[in-house]
UniProtKB/Swiss-Prot annotation:
It holds the Pfam family Herpes_glycop. Belongs to the herpesviridae glycoprotein M family. This is Envelope glycoprotein M. Interacts (via N-terminus) with gN (via N-terminus). The gM-gN heterodimer forms the gCII complex. It is found in: Virion membrane; Host Golgi apparatus, Host trans-Golgi network; Host endosome membrane; Host nucleus inner membrane. Keywords: Disulfide bond, Glycoprotein, Host endosome, Host Golgi apparatus, Host membrane, Host nucleus, Membrane, Transmembrane, Transmembrane helix, Viral envelope protein, Virion.
Length: 393
């Protein structure tokens, strides 16, 4: 039978293997997106051109061949699809590099500070829990499958694969933001490099990962519309309504989750709501062009057009309000703690006020802007705690 130390060594090596596997999957996804964008690489079609609004969808046996007028389902513009998929792949690769950096730093610091094996495992889970790494690899592989299916114009299968990908992506974001351990505070205090990775870098990665979920909410809603359009004999405007409803519900759920749950771990979280705002704008642009081109095929859809615009406008206003609310609450939380983050914010505000006074009243020298002010005098100079609680097992 293996002892506790052998079991901990096996767990540590298994975690390293997961990190390497996730990094390989993320790198493969990025390379697939690059190669799929090059005509000479042998892909039959460009994957991002899902809905061709310039030609009719007259596929033999397709659902729209049984209609007097034919039209493709609502989807994002080609540059938008490319940007959203590229952003998601970049986020997954960034998370993989973050995990690799965490493994390197943790291995070095564990030898230098003689951490106990259990502390090393706790710290590894704080950087990236094993379940998080597995979900990240599944996100990369499923999105790669989506790209290959879209390149071969298998719209229904691609839509089903993307829905699966979004489920993994949402779980990946939730696990990364919340899952960890609170038993490594002594190790983080003793090792500033480990603290920079497991706390500060983790907060940045949390922002972009949840931002990718916000963009994916729009894509998964439209993919559901494509799946419905290719599977059932239903009206075009119903698929557009279904896509809008799914996107709205998922976007609202994400913003509520960020504000209620994730804000307990990291306060500065503007990226998820900002990405929802970007996704709403992209959805609105695609819907406007779609309704304008296929108004005749859609029939009496004036109410649908107005309703779509109204819902997207309200969702955009909510996302904008959530950005402001999150930043204000973050400043209040850091001010109450007396952290360096709020000291820097206060210093920037003081500098801007002095600059405006100088320009408006025409007095003072530029050196006055560099004079020490109250912005950083009354706050603690110690490291701020970005993650107030490091999560739960």
């Amino acid at each position: 039978m293996c002892g506790p130390r052998n079991a901990e060594a096996v767990s540590w090596r298994s975690w390293l293997i997961e990190v390497c596997g996730f990094a390989l999957a993320a790198l493969t996804l990025v390379l697939t997106l690059i190669f799929a964008s090059l005509p000479e690489m042998g892909f039959p079609c460009f994957y991002a051109t899902v809905a061709d609004y310039d030609t009719l969808n007259d596929t033999s046996g397709g659902v729209w061949t049984r209609q007097p007028l034919v039209a493709p389902a609502l989807f994002l513009e080609t540059p938008t699809v490319t940007s959203f998929f590229g952003f998601t792949a970049t986020v997954l690769l960034a998370h993989a590099l973050y995990a690799v950096a965490g493994a390197v730093v943790l291995r070095r610091e564990a030898g230098r500070l003689a951490f106990q094996p259990s502390v090393v495992l706790y710290a590894a889970s704080t950087v990236a829990a094993p379940g998080t790494l597995m979900l990240g690899a599944l996100c990369a592989w499923t999105l790669q499958a989506v790209v290959l299916l879209m390149a071969h114009k298998q719209a229904g299968l691609a839509a089903a694969a993307y829905i699966t990908h979004f489920v993994f992506l949402a779980l990946f974001g939730a696990c990364h933001a919340c899952k960890g351990t609170g038993d490594v505070r002594a190790a983080l205090a003793a090792s500033p490099p480990l603290r920079r990775v497991a706390v500060h870098a983790r907060a940045v990665v949390t922002n972009v990962v949840l931002g990718a979920v916000g963009l994916g909410a729009a894509v998964v809603g439209l993919m559901l519309g494509v799946l419905l359009a290719n599977s059932f004999h239903i009206s075009l405007w119903k698929t557009a309504e279904a896509a809008l409803a799914v996107f709205t519900l998922l976007a609202l759920a994400l913003m509520v989750f960020v504000e209620v749950v994730v804000s307990g771990y990291v306060q500065v979280l503007p990226t998820p709501a900002f990405c929802v705002l970007v996704a709403s704008a992209a959805f609105g642009v695609s819907a406007h062009r779609y309704f304008a081109k296929f108004s005749e095929a859609l029939g009496e859809t004036h109410g649908v057009v107005i309703g779509t615009r109204a819902v997207l406008a309200v969702l955009s206003l909510i996302a904008l309000a959530m950005i402001v609310v999150r930043l204000v609450r973050a400043c209040i939380a850091h001010r109450a703690r007396g952290s360096r983050f709020y000291a820097n914010v206060d210093k920037a505000r003081t500098t801007a006020r002095r600059y405006l006074q100088k320009r408006l009243h025409g007095r003072g020298n530029d050196e006055y802007l560099l004079a020490p002010g109250s912005g950083d005098d009354e706050f603690d100079d110690g490291d701020e705690v970005v993650y107030e609680n490091l999560g739960f097992e």
